[in-house]
Amino acid sequence: MIKLYKRNPDGTQAYHEAWVTEQGVLEHWGVIGEVGEHQQHSFATGLDEAGNLASVLRKARENGFEELPDSALQTLVIEYEEALDDPQQAERRQALAGDLDEFLGWTGLGCCEGSDDGAGTLEVFCRVVDFDIASAAIAAEVENTDCGDFRRIYQLAGVD
């Protein structure tokens, strides 16, 4: 997968990404925080996977989209209080990491890197391109679910 970003004249940040599927290359683009649009491309004859990805993203790069260095990403943490005697609650919350990874990916905001539990809390770790937009989008996404009772969403200091 290749993820590209660009600041628009109106101040919004756009994303343009592509990844290899069984059918070819899936291209996905939009404004961060929104699902955007996508298009499936067939594999080009004579190109390997890297060449196909480069071909699909060529126009985006020509229009100023660039890969972000890892140092440009922020670590967002969603913290839950865990009932230590309720294994089902822990399983539901850990499954949240997979759901958030998909949500963050389809909205161009980033990815979820997993979760950790202990001392009565569960923390879900995400790498995002914009903490403010991602935290608001995540809060809205989980609001009416069994994972809407998070304690807080915060930015992990010292690792970004």
Predicted regions and their residues:
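Short N-terminal "domain-start" leader segments
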Residues: 1-23, 59-62, 83-101
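Short aromatic-glycine-(Arg/Gly/Cys) micro-motifs in beta-strand/loop hairpins
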Residues: 14-39, 73, 98-119
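A short, exposed loop/beta-hairpin motif centered on an aromatic-Gly-Thr core
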Residues: 34-48, 122-127
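A short, charged, amphipathic alpha-helix used as a generic interaction element across diverse proteins
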Residues: 44-62, 135-143
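Conserved short beta-strand edge segments in small beta-sheet-based binding/regulatory domains
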Residues: 66-67, 144-160
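Short glycine-/aliphatic-rich beta-strand segments at the starts of folded cytosolic domains
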Residues: 72-88
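Short, intrinsically disordered low-complexity segments
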Residues: 107-137
